[in-house]
């Protein structure tokens, strides 16, 4: 493992140098809004969608839990939406991210009935279908990874993949069995290198659906890289060789979200 340690250190050093240089970049990551179904600007659906987005940006939104879902209107103009903030972040950071994503939503997806927006701190999602309590792993995928492989040696790559996968799978089990559907890991690979991981599902999923979603998410990541993340609308996974989450808040979980969705009229 000694040669693997040196490769980890070398690539991590070069990555952290570039990471610090881009620390001030916007926290927007990606979005997905297919043109399969659309709406017109002055339609009932448009009004309902704006009502839903306004409720997410209001003072009464569930920023303290980091998760909220809302349904507005009646079929065929019914809109269902949710936001999910990263589980280690404060209500203030959650609020800022949700407000920012709401403000940009109709600019990025001006006429699509279905959309998901990925940010560093939160996810915003809405649809004309019932998206609550349903794990989505067949659309809206987004993968981001470091370009550096952990080592040019295949044996060392295989060792690293086993370590990452086993630790991330453990985190997935813990998340699936928690009320917040969120978990982190911190594992010392060597005296000099530590693996950090984070997994999260929307809390409306069952334990089984959350675990299934996270397992697929972990398997979709290129685990030979020195860092990667994968997003679906229902769950996401990330691992790095540097600390990227707020460790001080992990030990004090927020209260679980309400069991049933709220409804804005």
Curated annotation (Swiss-Prot):
Lineage: Eukaryota, Viridiplantae, Streptophyta, Embryophyta, Tracheophyta
Signal sequence range: 1-23
Organism: Arabidopsis thaliana (Mouse-ear cress)
Any Pfam family hit: Stress-antifung
Record family assignment: Belongs to the protein kinase superfamily. Ser/Thr protein kinase family. CRK subfamily.
InterPro entries documented for this protein: GNK2, GNK2_sf
Segments forming domain Gnk2-homologous: 27-131, 142-244
Highest taxon of the lineage: Eukaryota
GO biological process: programmed cell death; response to salicylic acid; systemic acquired resistance
Database matches in PROSITE patterns: GNK2
Protein name per Swiss-Prot or TrEMBL: Putative cysteine-rich receptor-like protein kinase 9
Localization (cell): Secreted
Induction description: By salicylic acid (SA).
Keyword tags: Glycoprotein, Receptor, Repeat, Secreted, Signal
Gene, per the UniProt record: CRK9
Chain positions carrying an annotated carbohydrate: 35, 60, 69, 153, 177, 246
Gene3D superfamilies: Gnk2 domain, C-X8-C-X2-C motif
Entry GO terms, CC: apoplast; secretory vesicle
Matches recorded under PANTHER family: CYSTEINE-RICH RECEPTOR-LIKE PROTEIN KINASE 9-RELATED (PTHR32099:SF42), CYSTEINE-RICH REPEAT SECRETORY PROTEIN (PTHR32099)
